[in-house]
Amino acid sequence: MKKFYLYILFCLVLIPSPSFAMKNDVLVSSETKYYKTIYESDSNVFVLSNVVDKTIEISEQEYNDVYDDVKVMESNSNQTSYKKIAISIYKSGNDFKYEVNLEWKKIPKVRSNDIIAIGFDNKNIKANGNYSFIQNFCTSDGCKSNNSYSLRTFSTGSSATFSLPTSSLTYLNQIFSFTVVKKITEKIISQTISGDYSHATSKININNALKHSVDVDSGIKLYNSISSYYDSIPVTKTTWTGSW
């Protein structure tokens, strides 16, 4: 057991820094939330089409106390996943950078096309590009990264849709970020952004997974035709106040 946990620690050391922040980026606002999602099937056999999920916010202590983080969620009719989501605002030169970071405490059983997103108030700002996405994961062969994703942009936010690795994993996290600029000449004294994540609990192809929008209050807004394919967590918000 001791060797096992030493191996996990070794893998974590090899994982790239969990942020897209550059040397000159300054963190000015952030919020971290911890969630537990319980998946229940209405039969003794776990059938993907009849899964009901319930998500509740938990404390950092409860999240950290889940010691069996390297196990895939159980294959019986009741499963529990734990997620940590962090949403951050960075001062980046004359502009700002938004970032959302999702970390899994337990590796999800279903691996399909998931969605990570950032919503923002578009009254005074607009996205300026510089989109970045990375998925960090560890297997028995070591730790790797993948930056393959499909981008969706809206006036009120942006999202990255991506496929989860299908191999046996011991660690998994995703990071998405982009920069924003002012679209007014007047001074801006506050910015509010939100981070959100939708995990596919059923197999769904990429074309259908892209059927969503993003805004600051609702986070990821799935079209009705695909809403039953995903679980959900509450939107996590952070607000910066100052002078820009």
Where are the language model's segments positioned?
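Serine/threonine-rich low-complexity intrinsically disordered regions
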Residues: 1-2, 59, 205
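Sec-dependent N-terminal signal peptides of Gram-positive bacterial secreted proteins and lipoproteins
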Residues: 1-23
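Intrinsic low-complexity, intrinsically disordered segments enriched in polar/basic residues
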Residues: 2-6, 30-37, 239
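Homeobox/homeodomain signature
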Residues: 4-5, 9-10, 48, 230, ...
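N-terminal cationic amphipathic segment used for targeting or macromolecule association
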Residues: 17-19, 33, 158
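N-terminal propeptides/leader regions of secreted preproproteins
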Residues: 22-84, 88
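Mature secreted bioactive peptide module from preproproteins
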Residues: 71-244
